């Protein structure tokens, strides 16, 4: 099956573990989810046929849950428990670890300088963002007023773009989240946690941008 003309966001939602494949190739399926596979591959100078073959293998597996057809209220509850609550746990712990690593290894050239600052910025931005969703946007959607939420949704999508840009800065600061050979246990654990955060946040944004928001605006 030809996947090249389909949007990345749609593929990430319809094929099991496609999101992990896109992450491996550094293809943005959340904020850039509307671009086709062919366009995303061309931008990264990747062979689209190789990626299509990998997607075809993944597509043979059953999908755990197809959120594209789930009720909007169920999607919202899932987002809060699976992503919002998780980010609220992840970021404070990562900030503590980054503070320690930057302090203890300040003399090493490979230390991720500025990481604490960028994680703190992401924490502050996401905390404000998630609160606005939970207090304003999500109740509107649950009350069937999603079609009137064009303003709040455009603000949320803009904030998603800003979070995505911060993730790119964090990846650059951490050598694409790759610990150096001399990294201590805390350093390695922190990078594992950052990888998990990036995976979670990209899935979170994709579910909102590519499923929840379009369906809410369509008047569901």
Swiss-Prot record:
Entries under InterPro entries matching the protein: FeS-repair_YftE, Hemerythrin-like, RIC_family
Q: Does the keyword Transferase apply?
A: no
Name its species. Answer: Escherichia coli O17:K52:H18 (strain UMN026 / ExPEC)
Subunit (UniProt): Homodimer.
An example Gene Ontology CC term for this record: cytoplasm
Descriptive protein name: Iron-sulfur cluster repair protein YtfE
Q: Which PANTHER family match?
A: IRON-SULFUR CLUSTER REPAIR PROTEIN YTFE
Indicate whether Iron appears among the record's keywords.
yes
* BP GO annotations: protein repair; response to nitrosative stress; response to oxidative stress
State the protein's purpose: Di-iron-containing protein involved in the repair of iron-sulfur clusters damaged by oxidative and nitrosative stress conditions.
CDD domains from the UniProt entry: Hr-like (cd12108)
Domain of life of the source = Bacteria
- Alphabetically ordered keywords of this record: Cytoplasm, Iron, Metal-binding, Stress response
Q: Which gene encodes it?
A: ytfE
The similarity annotation says: Belongs to the RIC family. YtfE subfamily.
Please provide an example of a Pfam family that matches this protein in its UniProt record. Hemerythrin
State the taxonomy lineage.
Bacteria, Pseudomonadati, Pseudomonadota, Gammaproteobacteria, Enterobacterales
Compartment(s) of residence: Cytoplasm
Q: Which GO terms describe its molecular function?
A: metal ion binding
């Amino acid at each position: 099956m030809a996947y090249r003309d389909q949007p990345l966001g749609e593929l990430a939602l319809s094929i099991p573990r496609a999101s992990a494949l896109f992450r491996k190739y550094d293809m943005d399926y959340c904020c850039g989810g509307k671009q086709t596979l062919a366009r995303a591959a061309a931008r990264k100078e990747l062979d689209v046929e190789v990626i299509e073959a990998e997607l075809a293998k993944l597509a043979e597996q059953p999908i755990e849950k197809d959120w594209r057809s789930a009720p909007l209220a169920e999607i919202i509850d899932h987002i809060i428990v699976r992503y919002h609550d998780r980010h609220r746990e992840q970021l404070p712990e990562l900030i503590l670890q980054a503070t320690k690593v930057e302090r203890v290894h300040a003399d090493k050239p490979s230390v991720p300088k500025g990481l604490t600052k960028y994680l703190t910025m992401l924490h502050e931005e996401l905390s404000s963002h998630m609160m606005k969703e939970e207090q304003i946007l999500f109740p509107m959607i649950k009350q069937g007023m999603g079609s009137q939420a064009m303003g709040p949704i455009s603000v949320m999508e803009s904030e998603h773009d800003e979070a995505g840009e911060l993730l790119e800065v964090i990846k650059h600061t951490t050598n694409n989240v790759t610990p150096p050979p001399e990294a201590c246990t805390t350093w390695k654990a922190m990078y594992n946690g950052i990888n998990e955060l990036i995976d979670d946040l990209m899935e979170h944004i994709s579910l909102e941008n590519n499923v929840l928001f379009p369906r809410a605006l369509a008047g569901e």
